[in-house]
């Protein structure tokens, strides 16, 4: 198992066996994936400095006129979501190569859903996922409640009791396929979720808080 807690704050630390100081190491696979994702630079690579043993992620720019290359720290130039994707992608590759199970908390934080859907589809593709790697993640985004992405038994919900703070885990397939709450294969899961068909949804209304604050300001 590879477990990523708080994927939104994950940082990948790269080390090289015999690094050259100030050299830029561009990993072909990660760089190609980053370009598909949509980086703002010409490439991404890792730089080892004199005072830091760990390689740092840099955005690489190439001047087409004088052929010179400039590297800028990626956290200055790239978006937070782009850096998260670049940090996570090598772990996806490792899982696919070893047939491992990748468990990710907040898998979709700051990353475009289309990129994540592509990764999910790769895990589902038996022609690509030849070692039968598995992906398990949690999310607050209902866009993944999609029959084209997951089987009913692959979609899980967590229902929390506000009084006891106990949580119950159950699958979409637990509802069966018949009756008023039955779930059929090609239904619109997301729409049904928003009308509380499956539970695990909370009605949140901050209006009273704002009304109280603004009312106090008005009276003051």
What annotation goes with each model-predicted range?
Residues 112-113:
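Conserved D-loop-proximal element of ABC-family nucleotide-binding domains
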Residues 32, 93, 121-124:
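Surface-exposed alpha-helical segments enriched in charged/polar residues
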Residues 37-40, 97-98, 151:
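Short, well-ordered loop/turn elements at secondary-structure boundaries
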Residues 105-107:
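Walker B catalytic acidic pair
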Residues 61, 118-220:
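C-terminal lobe/lid and adjacent interdomain/linker elements of RecA-like ASCE P-loop ATPase modules
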Residues 1-86, 192, 207-210, 217-220:
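Phosphate-coordinating catalytic segments in nucleotide- and nucleic-acid-processing enzymes
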Residues 74-102, 118:
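GG-anchored amphipathic helix commonly corresponding to the ABC/SMC/Rad50 NBD signature/C-loop
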């Amino acid at each position: 198992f590879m477990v990523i807690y708080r994927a939104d704050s994950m940082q990948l630390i790269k080390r090289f066996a015999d690094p050259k100081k100030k050299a830029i190491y561009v990993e072909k696979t990660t760089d190609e994936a980053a370009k598909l994702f949509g980086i703002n630079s010409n490439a991404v690579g890792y730089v080892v400095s004199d005072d830091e043993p760990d390689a740092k992620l840099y955005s690489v720019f190439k001047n087409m006129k004088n052929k010179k290359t400039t590297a800028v720290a990626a956290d200055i130039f790239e978006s937070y979501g782009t850096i998260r994707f670049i940090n996570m992608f090598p772990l996806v590759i490792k899982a696919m190569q070893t047939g491992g199970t990748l468990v990710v908390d907040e898998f979709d934080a700051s990353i475009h859903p289309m990129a994540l859907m592509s990764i999910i589809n790769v895990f589902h593709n038996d022609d690509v996922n030849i070692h039968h790697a598995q992906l398990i993640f949690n999310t607050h985004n209902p866009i993944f409640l999609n029959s084209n992405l997951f089987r009913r038994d692959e979609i899980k919900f967590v229902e929390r009791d506000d009084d006891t703070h106990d949580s119950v885990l159950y699958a979409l397939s637990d509802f069966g396929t018949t009756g008023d709450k039955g779930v059929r294969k090609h239904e619109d899961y997301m729409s049904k979720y928003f009308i509380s068909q499956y539970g695990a949804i909370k009605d949140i209304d901050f209006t009273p808080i704002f009304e109280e604050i603004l009312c106090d300001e008005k009276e003051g």
